[in-house]
Amino acid sequence: EFGKNIHALASYYLRGENIDKMELSLSEHEAAVWNYLKGIKYFGYEVVNTEYNLSLKLGDAFFGGRLDALVKEDDTYYILDYKTGSAPKNAKFDYQTMIYLLAVSKFFKTDKVKFIYIDLKNKEELAVEYSPELGEEYQKRLVNAAAKINSDEIPPKKTECKCEYKAVCF
């Protein structure tokens, strides 16, 4: 619930909507996190979109997701991802990072893209910067992952899936 509230508040705020009543209803902890988030430099950049669905086709496979926010300063795009838990251990090669950076780079036809994990718990930021070389590596990894999923190489587990993608697990 906490994470959903912060995500919604950030989306409304970045779209320029009046959030006064929402801010008044925040708990002390939520207010502290919200004040940190709205004070980050990225919230002063040009807003491209919030809660932005994107997709990417590589070979026969489709990849997609929903960005928390996409902002821009000068000619650089910043993908913002608010984490109420922790950022991935290897953020550079996390599937979310790879898909989002590659999709935004291809859609906007630019190499000037950065993925910013915003760790709300520890009030830290972790940035991954896109490059053409990294994009090539991402494409290889994603195509290989899709091929493995579509082959018999990865048998479905018999245990209950608890990941955020459980709706599409086999």
Locations of regions flagged by a protein language model:
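RecB-family 4Fe-4S metal-dependent nuclease core
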Residues: 1-170
